[in-house]
């Protein structure tokens, strides 16, 4: 499943770059030779991946900031919904820390960075309790993602960094896919508390 997600995101990256180039070329041609020369700055693997990291980063960070601090430890288990089985599921805070922790675990092999102090598992450091601390941890993890994306080239994307068993492109794209996966769970937690996710507010107004 993880490999399939990585392949899907990789194909999307390549298709997106090709579509972008076609659209830019067509638009520049309509504006004349000078505009065409200025507009044709081709995307790179690094720039396309960096854009996708920015996209998921905005969705996740905005969702995290939308949840009031007093609701950060909310879990669907506490709703006691008849017929449901939410026993032991992560709280909203741990969902956010899980995304950040996974970002570090997935992207640090690409950059060679050491893991932050206290990061031992997928639930993130136990000492991070407040909303501000958790969101800072989240933002820092995406900064590592941008750093990882900047290292990608056509020559190294199929190499395995360090002792990793995965290629650079698989790690880079899987980080994006994983974050989007858990963003979907964050959305459900927000809606269970009567909060419309920021990304959906324009659509609902």
What are these regions (language model features)?
Residues 1-4:
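Positively charged n-region of N-terminal signal peptides that target proteins for export
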